[in-house]
Amino acid sequence: MEKPVKSAVAKNTLSFAFVVGTTSLAFVVSQLDVSIVNIALPQISKSFAADISKLQWIVDAYTIAFAVLMLSAGGMGDLLGSKRLFTIGMIVFGIASAGCGLSWNAISLISFRVLQGIGAATMIPSSLSILNQSFAHDNVKRGRAVALWTAAGGVSIAAGPILGGLLIHISNWRMIFFVNIPFCLAGILLSFKLRESQRHPNKGFDIPGQLTWMITLTALIAAIIEWHHLGFNNPIIYGGLIFSAIMLVIFLLIEKKAKAPILPLDLFSSANFNVLIWMGIVLNGSYYGTVFVLSLYMQDVLRYSSLAAGMAFLPLTTGFIISNLISSKLMAKYGTRIPILLGLSIGIAGFLALLIARADTPYWQLFIPFIIIPMGMGLAVPPMTTSILANVAKTRSGTASAILNTTRQAAGAIGVAVFGTMANGGAVAIVHAIGMSALISAGGLICSALLIFRYLRTT
């Protein structure tokens, strides 16, 4: 018979600020490394003579590993304990960051980026699970905690290009990876004060499910990235897409029969859960893909320096900070549905405003979508995350958060692959890719808003 395990943080033992601050470090470093790399792509390309497809792999190697392993990490958190997994993730991420900074060619950098993704995949679900279990007794406090945690990640992903531009200006692109190490050390040391979360030591581990999910996502991303280089008529491309679809079906069949699946399909019986997962997919795919193309646009089309390009992204940081502060207050007053719909509406307007981008567009015109897009994201994401956790039992919070973040990271990798492929072909292709990414993103957000309006019940 299992003995009850103490909750992640005993009430009144550790302060609200300490728990949120410690767990947020994981989201900060993991999200920072999504966007900070984008601003360094031209410099990395020069150092390693890398074309756009290799640059896509440098970005997507991280997000693929992140997405592939996060489902297992959610189950591992439920199995081993969230605190333990959080600490392990911080250690792996720190070592991988040092390796990225010391990499000697594109292949070595891609390899260490995979290791970074493994570290991130263990940190994120465990940190969110710690938050959920720490404040499960107080919905308002849990909402505030998740909003602040989300805000930290949102601000870091928006601040990544700015920090990257400054570090490259002061030193070189390698510093964008070394900067993670102090954050990781702080997270490791602070995590020792957290109490362990509820565990389920008798829970199994779904190895067949993990392997088929890894093959499914990797085959899909590889086919999309190499599409421009090889052409769709190449059997590697259409064969890869067909193979990925077959493996997805096999994965779902395995999960349906598995005793301890990494993707519990019964969670998808909830309409709330389904529309929120779809929304997370759309938001990440749109944002990651668009920022990737905008980074190329700023430096390869508008000819901004790394520092100028980084500073040009400053409105994204400002927009995230403002909207996240507003989001928690709106949730406390209106629940989750209204802030989500408001955020999606603002995001739609922001992506449509990006259609003005041309080869000679002045920055003051770009400023408008640059601040509106993150404001929409910042309003919508915290209530989305809160709603996901509110729709599952406390003991399944690790798995639920892993599903949310897995699908979001997978969507981010696909967004970079698709939008990046459209940008492969010089300045004209990059400008065209921005317009297409804006239309696709706006369309996805419109669909999300309609689904949220129809199905989501406030929590």
Where are these regions (language model features)?
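Extracytoplasmic
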Residues: 18-60, 123-124, 128, 291-295
